[in-house]
Amino acid sequence: MQYRSLTFEEIEILESNSCWAEDWSRVEVAEDGFQAKFFHRVMFYGDIQLGSFQKEVEITKGFVKHSGINDATLRNVTVGNDCLIEKVGNYINNYTIGDDCLISNISVMETTEGATYGEGNLISVLNEVGDGNVIFFHDLNSQFAAFMVKHFNDKDLKNAIRRLVKEEIARTNPERGTIGNNVKIVNTREITNTVIQDDCEISGASRLSDCTILSSEYASVYIGTGVICENSIISDGSSIVNSVKMQDCFVGEACQISNGFTASQSVFFANSFMSNGEACAAFCGPFCASHHKSSLLIGGMFSFYNAGSGTNFSNHAYKMGPMHWGILERGTKTASGSYLLMPATIGTFSVCFGKLMHHPNTTALPFSYLIAEADKMYLVPGRNITTVGLYRDIRKWPKRDMRPQQTQKSIVNFDWLSPYSVGEILQGKKILENLRQASGDNVSSYNYHEYVINATSLRKGIKYYDIALRIYMGAVLKRAHKWGFFGKPQTEIGLGRWNDLSGLLLPVSEERRLIEDVKSGSLETIEEVVNRFREINENYRIYQWAWTYRMILEYYGINEITPEDDARIKRDYIEARRAWIAEIKKDAEKEYEMGDVDREVFESFVNSLDHEVDFEN
């Protein structure tokens, strides 16, 4: 924008409207469109730049005021075109304000020396008293954060990532606080050292200090009444409302945090929903949900997670400090009143009931129920595979992704059966078969570590795991035909173990390659690292086929997939899928018989199950 000095006539108008300047020569205005008559009772200090003031601004639906500045003190401020700024109780200091903004009834807004806007903040998740394992920056996604948490004990990698982040921040951080275009800030007390991007609305917040709000035209951010937010970054499409208190947190895209939720040293990504409760040193990956006042998420890594009321974790043995932590793998739930003593690792898509005290590690028995009754711990392997809850979950998550295409930083792979989870299922099936072989069939229960597995549960577990394996192989084979890569895989990438980096499913070999490329300097910028995550995700189906092809050969004891084998796998797939749907229908009928499920709801669900045959071919 081109600026000019004020004319003598404009200064006269301003002064007649009770405006005052420390030095009128340091007040510059837009060459076109500046109108002094829309300024009343304004005090100018330092260097001031003012845009044009020609349009009206909508205050609320059906109520407009002309743009201008009234009842405000400004020091070293640039104001864009057609803003309305009024009722500033204290002052605005060292800020750049964009076009078409409404700022009304605020106390103070300023940038102080050394402001970082929440960028570069190093926090410790999982281990509450650790050295720090997540660095905040505006392009952080769930993969990058999980990668840091997992590997920051590698000092060379940690130093390399810190250097990349430092360079990115130095390149992008503004010299002073900025307010984007179309921003609305009303009835707010204090905004300090905060960058607020386009189309954000802040209404009634108490304090925003050292924050970056990554709002955008396609996914605006809303900050509501009573919110206190310090040393944090809030991403596109999120809302923080109703007296949330947050320190040292990163909030990813389309998250909702509300109703007095308190959080410190935690990260939340991609459509997570947090209300009423508390989080401390928690890593909440995509689609985490906690609704209840009495739930505490502490020292844990979660994704696709649902916390029942009264869920609690203990990261403290009252000896060496609150340093213990655990991982609840993708899709895990904790029932009402559940408690987990860290350290612990819970396998994918499991459900925890009661007070689990013996540091369980069930990664090799996924989709299980873990049940504590008095001093006994029961494990029901594979039970969750055939529940209504799992069926609803795996279908609802893709529909509930509220992130516009333009703002999807975190990668979310929705496959519930993947080389990662199926690898665990293969281990689980083998463990159950070995237990059965070791103790025989004529026993009432089996022991697995501290857990008791009833004989009927073990037999059903083997059956359910096998159903899942056949569904997986058939589905991948069908996709290989459809996408044209059926036959011997063209790559060995994908063989071996797989991991879940908070939504990104990838071969361990690719994760190791990424570590080496960051350490060696082959990846020279944050953008290149983020692009590598995207590249791995784009090749997911190819890597998956390499892994699944080998699995099919081993499962069926064949050397290649002949047309006869292909037909057999398809038959097994259809048979397994129908058995799976039949078990889910039984689970739904059992719940309906409890008497409080509306018949229409039950029939609608059963009808959706009946349509599953449409997806067999």
Model regions and ranges:
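N-terminal charge/polar-biased segments
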Residues: 1-3, 616-617
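Glycine-rich hexapeptide-repeat left-handed beta-helix
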Residues: 3-9, 13-25, 29-53, 57-69, ...
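Right-handed parallel beta-helix
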Residues: 62-70, 165-186
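Flexible, glycine/proline-enriched loop segments at strand-loop-helix junctions
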Residues: 82
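Long, charge-dense tracts
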Residues: 90-91, 95-102, 107-117, 121-123, ...
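Long, compositionally biased intrinsically disordered regions
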Residues: 113, 373-617
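Core alpha-helical transmembrane segments of integral membrane proteins
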Residues: 179, 183, 187-202, 210-221, ...
